[in-house]
Amino acid sequence: MAKSNWLIYGANGYTARLVIEQAIRRGHKPIIAGRTEAKIRPIAEQTGLDYIVFDLTDGHLLKKALSNVKLVFNAAGPFIHTSQKLIDACLKYRVNYTDITGEVPVFQNVFLYSKQAEQNKIVLMPGIGFDVIPSDCLAKYVANQVPNAVELDIAFTGLEHISPGTLKTMVEMIPGGGLIRRDGRLIPSHLGKGSKKVIFPDGEHTVVPIIWGDLETAYHSTGIPNITTYMAYPNFMVPFLPVGIPVMQRIFANNFAKRVVQRLIEIVVKGPDKAAREHRRAYVWASAKNSNGDQKRAWLDIPETYSFTAIAAVVSIEEILSVQPKGALTPAMAFGPDFVLKIEGVKRYDNLPAQNNK
């Protein structure tokens, strides 16, 4: 029997369409929703799914939309603009909340509602895609094997081709500068500086510190007070980042310029095509250390990031509806570090082949 007890908001977005495909493949019939009927109705007609059109500022329609579902999956980014109203409604009407954010402020905000979510017997679980399931689970995995770990580094590859929504979110975040976690606190850092080399399953990459959701989520999952998150960049780009990023920060600090660029992104950027999604791989690395010098490293080899997100989001929703966790939780907090291995196509390594592990 098809399961139609959850709703996708922002169903017309690039990633949302992939999630819908996976949901249908796995026997679900989610209700699809968004702000604009001209964008939502064609998807409903193509898929045979029920739909509802509403703006998040319309409390009456929001209540109606949530009245017959057990879970909301928010796919409408940047989530800093959409998550609060949906979280408020989910708490009010006792509906589980999920999304695919990677935005640190959104994670910080969600954790403020943990006790209220627990009292209302629902879960608030942001980040059920590439942000942050693989890194969250891998961080928890290595942390569990290093007693009293004090330092956690996380790095990944695989964002060479990104969706309009991801790029718009990056434009939103760049003006704020970089972040790292030190002694349990988030502190500013210089975007584009601090590169290092990391060995991944496909070889060595240069990685550079970036703002990633794990700066907040991994702190809750592991309790480790010092966390840095990195992304792989092509070697030719690395020398230009310390100069280029400050220029972008100044440009995108102007709200008009930022909105123009985000509108251009909507028009021009299409996201990875089917061939890229089917054939590319992404890799995640995590390292935990303690003050005695004990260290544990591990790697994940996963499908292309958007393919992974589509599968992972639906598997997460299934797990939430089955296990019924309560509170504001990360995926690893709710389901454990091995949860990522339930997702099709994922491999975890404690050691790499000799040719790569130098």
Segments predicted by a language model, with ranges:
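ADP-ribose/adenylate-binding Rossmann-like module
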Residues: A89-F107
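Short acidic/histidine-rich motifs immediately flanking catalytic phosphotransfer sites
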Residues: T47-G48, L66-L71, K92-V95
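Conserved Rossmann-fold cofactor-binding substructure of NAD(P)-dependent oxidoreductases
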Residues: V53-H81
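N-terminal Rossmann NAD(P)H-binding glycine-rich loop of SDR-like oxidoreductase domains
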Residues: W6-R26
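N-terminal Rossmann-fold cofactor-binding loop
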Residues: A33-E37, D55-L56
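Active-site-lining helix/loop region of Rossmann-like oxidoreductase modules
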Residues: Y9, N144-N290, D294-R297, S307
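Rossmann-fold NAD(P)-binding glycine/threonine-rich loop
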Residues: T101-I122
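C-terminal helical cap and adjacent loop that interface with cofactors, partners, or active-site loops
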Residues: G271-K358
